[in-house]
Amino acid sequence: DETQKHFNGKIDFVLHSIGMSPNVRKNRKYYDLDYNFMNKTLDISAVSFHKMLQVAYKQDAIKKNGSILALTYIAAQRTYDSYSDMANAKALLESICRSFGMIYGEKNGVRINTISQSPTKTTAGKGIDGFDLFFDFADKMSPLGNASAEECADYCIMMFSDYTRKVTMQNLFHDGGYSSTGISKKMIEQYQGSK
């Protein structure tokens, strides 16, 4: 109610972009997770999205045909050694998007999508062991290179617009082509050079 008063009405769009794992920060391996930390990871990185959607839904806070986005990562579908329990959190986040996308779409035409972004140099990203090497690897594997934080913001703005009014319940890759690349010429050349 207070948010709607502050914005003089219903909300046009929302971006969920929070994520954190104490297990990742403490470099705990997936086979040795602290379950209290894991619960915190899931709560902050995924369940918070459900909580926000549930409140918005019950308060009827999002305008008809509004747009809701959450940032995710390809580790929800693939294995990345140092991503640990964040991969589970991102998989849950994407599932919440699909489940609530059906409900909110039928009720009010509200679109809910996730954007699977390239590795991005953020505070959270820097906490991942070996992040700089992985950032370089993904950049070399991607035909267009890694998408920057600014480019991700541009993509979000497009997804909030009416140009995407029929796009919902999707996980959209914004990664320079990384998600569809088997191996790039740059990586083959680097591998050959290391022999």
Predicted region positions:
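Hydrophobic structural elements of the Rossmann-like NAD(P)H-binding subdomain
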Residues: 15, 69, 112-115, 125, ...
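Conserved amphipathic alpha-helix within the SDR
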Residues: 1-9
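Catalytic loop of short-chain dehydrogenase/reductase
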Residues: 19-106, 116-121, 145, 178
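Short C-terminal tail/terminal secondary-structure segment
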Residues: 168-195
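C-terminal helical subdomain
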Residues: 47, 114, 132-167, 172-176
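Local beta-strand N-terminus motif with an aromatic residue
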Residues: 10-11, 38
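Conserved hydrophobic beta-strands of the Rossmann-like cofactor-binding core
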Residues: 11-19
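Short beta-loop-alpha junction of Rossmann-like oxidoreductase domains
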Residues: 24, 118-130, 183
